[in-house]
């Protein structure tokens, strides 16, 4: 679909912006893939009637999920309005979120080492946290490349 879309543009635009178009498609595809990788292990875990996440894991991830949802909503609004002003705020928020998610992984690894809880549940949780980090990263990367794609051509 990318090649068909670019065929409709003039050659100068394709040369100037084609890379950003393909990068945007890649980031959007990776974003969707990460969301499915986040959900699939959870669904399989539930379908197999394995133990649920413990209260600590639920609380930690719930807080992070709210922040991720807010980031995605803000980015969606900016994309829809083609408004990339103050994008640094979203970039900072994404960096903070990825730091929080890294901390969640470290905490979970410490819980595994102290042998508290189920290893199977911990593996599902670690997968969720890792894929949540990917969602945050790909969301911001999509924003950055979209901004580059939409920018007016600047001649030196």
Show where each model-derived region lies:
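Cytosolic, long alpha-helical scaffolding segments
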Residues: 1-156
């Amino acid at each position: 679909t990318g090649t068909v879309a670019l065929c409709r543009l003039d050659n100068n635009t394709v040369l100037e912006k084609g890379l950003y178009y393909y990068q945007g498609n890649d980031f959007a595809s990776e974003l969707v893939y990460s969301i499915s990788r986040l959900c699939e292990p959870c669904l399989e875990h539930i379908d197999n009637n394995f133990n649920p996440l413990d209260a600590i894991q639920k609380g930690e991830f719930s807080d992070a999920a709210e922040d991720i949802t807010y980031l995605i909503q803000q980015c969606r609004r900016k994309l829809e309005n083609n408004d990339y002003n103050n994008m640094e705020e979203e970039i900072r928020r994404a960096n903070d979120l990825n730091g929080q998610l890294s901390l969640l992984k470290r905490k979970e690894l410490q819980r595994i080492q102290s042998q508290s809880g189920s290893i199977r549940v911990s593996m599902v949780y670690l997968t969720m946290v890792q894929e949540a980090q990917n969602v945050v990263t790909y969301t911001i990367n999509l924003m950055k490349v979209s901004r580059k794609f939409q920018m007016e051509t600047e001649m030196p």
